[in-house]
């Protein structure tokens, strides 16, 4: 039984997307009472064209933020940058920024990939 499982794991290739930086930092914005960070998302999946960004607390509950694109189209093997603004009163609550693949086709693998980066304290 275990041999079959190990074999399947070895032959299966898991493609996900990438997000950088690993430990983003908030910086002051030119707008009053807002802080800003930027993350880059790289699409490694040919079955996914859209990605959603989100900011979360330590319990993975969403925190309100502002970005030009919450959901953004990213072609296969391309990058996109998300600029995220947050009210500075939430700075201590925001622990993670995550990107999640958005499935749009029935022929896709059916697997949603979600990658989170942790904010440095």
Where are these regions (language model features)?
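Hydrophobic beta-strand positions in extracellular immunoglobulin-like domains
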Residues: 40-41, 55, 86
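Hydrophobic residues positioned within well-ordered beta-strands of beta-sheet architectures
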Residues: 37, 51, 80-82, 95-97
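Sec-dependent N-terminal signal peptides
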Residues: 3-13
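Terminal connector regions
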Residues: 88-121
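Intrinsically disordered, low-complexity Pro/Gly/Ser/Thr-rich segments with frequent PxxP/GP/PP motifs
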Residues: 62-92
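Short, solvent-exposed loop/turn segments enriched in Ser/Thr/Gly
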Residues: 22, 31-38, 92-96
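Short acidic, flexible loop segments centered on an aromatic residue
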Residues: 44-62, 100-101
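N-terminal edge beta-strand
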Residues: 16-32, 66
């Amino acid at each position: 039984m275990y041999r079959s499982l190990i074999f399947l794991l070895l032959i299966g290739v898991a493609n996900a997307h990438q997000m950088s930086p690993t430990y983003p930092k908030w910086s002051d914005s030119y707008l009053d009472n807002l802080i800003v960070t930027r993350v880059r998302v790289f699409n490694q999946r040919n079955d996914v064209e859209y990605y959603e960004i989100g900011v979360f607390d330590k319990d993975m509950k969403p925190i309100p933020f502002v970005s030009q694109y919450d959901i953004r189209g990213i072609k296969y093997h391309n990058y996109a940058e998300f600029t995220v603004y947050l009210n500075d009163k939430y700075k201590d609550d925001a622990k993670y920024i995550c990107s999640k693949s958005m499935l749009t086709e029935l022929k896709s693998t059916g697997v949603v990939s979600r990658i989170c980066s942790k904010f440095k304290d």
